[in-house]
């Protein structure tokens, strides 16, 4: 059975409405997509790390409840599990503050065994962080060797926009590994100060990875490949919260792909 393996951060999101906390739920960009897939009965795995504390226990229990094995989560004895504060505005968009205290030794964990046509999800700053780069590359190399499909979501946030130039070589390396790239217009604004989808694809993506999907919140979804140039309208809706919207888009897209037993990246588009 095909597997979907993610690597990324697990964090406890404390959600505020009107300056009052309303909920506390485990989150993380790749993690959110894996949770959606686990709930849908897909065979998933997640590579991550958390502290040996109450927050870490909440995260691990949440994973078990959502059909995600915890075998590949490094529970570190030093440091603390990360926490974020998510402040929702009137449009239910979130502004984040992060609190992190990681140990020096990171991601000391065995990776799951990959097979051909498995899907590997990578993204966010976790896939760019120099401290974790060696481990991320180890997974990407294994995926390439086993002919797994690599799905890359840059999920590049405003907190890192001043590092965009410094991180550019690592972003390019991730694009070179990727079989499918899915990003939002917001990501590319912070990465490249660009908002034109066709220009982003032509100048920044296509040379490295021909399969590109770009979302724009409540606006259209754009698909660009060597053979396809299509835009898909998005039905209007009243969002309860936009937290994890792009992450769950990833989950839905991958769920559709996994429904086809022998679907390679170039066949999906």
Predicted regions, residues:
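Single conserved hydrophobic/aromatic residue that forms the stacking wall/gate
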Residues: 262-265, 269
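Conserved N-terminal subdomain of the carbohydrate kinase-like
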Residues: 43-124
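Active-site metal-binding loops of divalent metal-dependent hydrolases
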Residues: 10, 125, 154, 248
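Short, conserved phosphate/pyrophosphate- and ester-handling motifs at nucleotide-, phospho-/glycolipid
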Residues: 37, 184, 246
């Amino acid at each position: 059975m095909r597997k979907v393996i993610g690597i990324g951060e697990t964090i406890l999101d404390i959600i505020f409405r009107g300056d009052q906390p309303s909920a506390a739920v485990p989150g993380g960009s790749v993690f959110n997509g894996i949770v959606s897939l686990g709930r849908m009965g897909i065979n998933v795995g997640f590579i991550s790390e958390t502290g040996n504390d109450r927050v870490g226990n909440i995260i691990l229990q949440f994973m078990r409840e959502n059909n995600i094995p915890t075998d590949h989560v490094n529970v570190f004895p030093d440091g603390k599990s990360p926490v974020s504060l998510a402040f929702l505005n009137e449009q239910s968009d979130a502004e984040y503050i992060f609190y992190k205290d990681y140990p020096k030794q990171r991601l000391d964990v065995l990776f799951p065994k990959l097979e051909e046509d498995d899907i590997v999800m990578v993204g966010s700053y976790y896939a760019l962080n120099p401290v974790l780069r060696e481990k991320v590359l180890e997974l990407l190399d294994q995926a390439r060797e086993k002919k797994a499909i690599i799905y890359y979501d840059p999920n590049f946030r405003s907190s890192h926009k001043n590092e965009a130039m410094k991180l550019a070589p690592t972003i390019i390396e991730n694009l070179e590994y990727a079989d499918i790239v899915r990003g939002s217009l917001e990501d590319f604004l912070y990465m490249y100060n660009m908002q034109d989808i066709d220009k982003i694809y032509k100048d920044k993506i296509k040379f490295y990875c021909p399969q590109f999907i770009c979302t724009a919140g409540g606006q259209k979804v754009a698909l660009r490949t060597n053979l396809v140039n299509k835009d898909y309208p998005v039905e209007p809706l009243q969002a309860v919260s936009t937290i994890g919207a792009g992450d769950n888009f990833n989950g839905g897209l991958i769920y559709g792909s996994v429904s086809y037993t022998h679907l390679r990246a170039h066949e999906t588009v």
